[in-house]
Amino acid sequence: DRAGLKGVAVLFAILPRPLVKVVLSLAANANRLPGWLAPPFRELNLGVKGVVMSLYYSDVTMDRKIHGAVGFDTKIAGETDGSSVEEAYAKLRAAQAGLRSMTVRDRVAFIRRLRESILARQEWIIDQIQEATGKSRTDALTSEIFGTLDHLLFLEKSAEKHLREKKVPTPPVLMGKKSVVRYEPLGTVLVISPWNYPFYQAIVPITSAFVCGNTVAYKPSEYTPLLGVVETVLADAGFNEGWVRVFYGAGEVGSKLIDQKPGKIFFTGSTATGKKIMAQASRELTPVELELGGKDPMVVFADANLDRAVAGAAWGALTNTGQSCTSVEKIIVEDSIFDDFRDRLVKEVGRLKLGVDKDGGADIGIMTNDMQTSIVAAHLEDAEKKGAKVLHGAGWDRKSRAVPPLVFDGVTRDMKVYREESFGPVLPLIRFKSEEEAIEIANDSEYGLSASVWSKDLVRA
């Protein structure tokens, strides 16, 4: 921060030049220092490189504010040019040879240190997440921190077991031979993450690729880049700067990264962007893993526990303000209990507190960006125009990112809120009279991501 930068500047001003060189040399080699001495020099190394070369060791630039590096808003001219991307990729490929030769156990040691770093810095990380996304503190803690730590603990406990060489049966035609399954790194993996879970969707795929022996090119969303956060925890854990490189920027930067022929692309985001990535990757037959959009149905039968179902609908639709690919977006309720369920749901969402908090007092955060807010507004206006009743949230001004839960009754199939992904705090209610009709409504979608059935009859569910 600014105070730390001033302190370093004063220190360097009063120290003799030879001693300054010694300090900078120690900072550059912080990973080789004893455990008690390494952290402050890692911080210094990261800070110096952050100021001089942007926030992670390559000429990655974007026309957005920088808060953490120098304590004031500034701009970096332009986005990453092709030569910078090529140079950074060359360094990733060069570093991969050394990473590949490490044992899984050695890589897991870095995972353990990373988990410890995140635990130590969790309050600061949550602050950065809230500033970037507008999440409630509870959402930031449970979905971003808890989930990430859980994943890292899994890698610590299970990576060696899952990645060790395994003997498998040999077919009779190869009698006399031995067969084994051996897991080999892919090389450099490109991770492109979404704006809705910027920390979790960074650390989880980065570490999954790393523990398998891959270097990682990571591009966060331009909406929630979390400038310097990922770099800080990785450096704190002792990650070599050549193992993971962060590239800031918009879609053009992602396209340049794909052109570098990564070993694999892991993308989470919209269906439209996923199609573009797959089309570009197909030119080189680059393997892709895509996690895209959804219009996830929740089917509630008459024999369901209504209190639990109502709580489940509110949680499923409003966690992360509905900005999740697996959010409940179609609530399909059996006709005989529809009115009771609807009234309970309106009462449930009406007691929830909306806002960005610092003490865990808010139940729902605000929308992350104006782009997605405008989509929710368009869905609301379309539903009202076509006859839907807004039972909660009708007073929203259609502009503020503080969007209240929007409960719809009278939803029909021609409405956007029925067909398109809203990715916001929407709760469209739809009646059904038979099991067959419920299944048909649930499957009446171009998406196929997640769904839930609420009933005491496990056979039917």
What are these regions (language model features)?
Residues G82-V85, V104, Q122, L306, ...:
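Residues at or immediately preceding the N-termini of alpha-helices
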Residues R107, L152, G213, V244, ...:
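Residue-level signal for inorganic ion chemistry
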Residues P169-R308, F432:
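Rossmann-like NAD(P) dinucleotide-binding subdomain of oxidoreductase/dehydrogenase enzymes
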Residues R2-F72:
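Mature-region segments of soluble proteins
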Residues A77-T80, P262, K353, K385, ...:
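Conserved C-terminal structural/oligomerization subdomain of aldehyde/semialdehyde dehydrogenase
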Residues A77, A94-S101, V191, M298-V300, ...:
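Short, well-ordered beta-strand elements within core beta-sheets of diverse protein domains
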